[in-house]
Amino acid sequence: SAKVNATKTMHAQTVKYISAEIQKCSLGEANFMGTDQDCPATAAKAVTGAVNTMNDKNPYSTANKAIRSSTAFNEGYVSLSATNTTTIQVNTCTKTGCATADKMTATISTD
């Protein structure tokens, strides 16, 4: 469905965006996530910055932003959490019910 595909795309774009923004600190920039966060990048700063700067809407609930600080799997949400100072966990559910096949996960390192 279009909602499933939209959620899968958001998951991939979120991982790509966070990774690219963290890289800015490695390249000597003073800020990342626009000017929302100061370098050096930590997992917590990356989560906060992504939630503050990404405005994608949840395709299942368009009044809500899809990118959020959470560990939960709920349809249409890309949940971000700092596992430790250097690891960001990304948990996404693409379809109502969130069966195992409908869950996407990724980890991003700030190192």
Mark where each language-model region is.
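Periplasmic/extracellular, small/polar-rich flexible segments of pilin-like filament-forming proteins
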Residues: 19-111
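Amphipathic alpha-helical segments typified by the pilin-like N-terminal helix
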Residues: 1-13
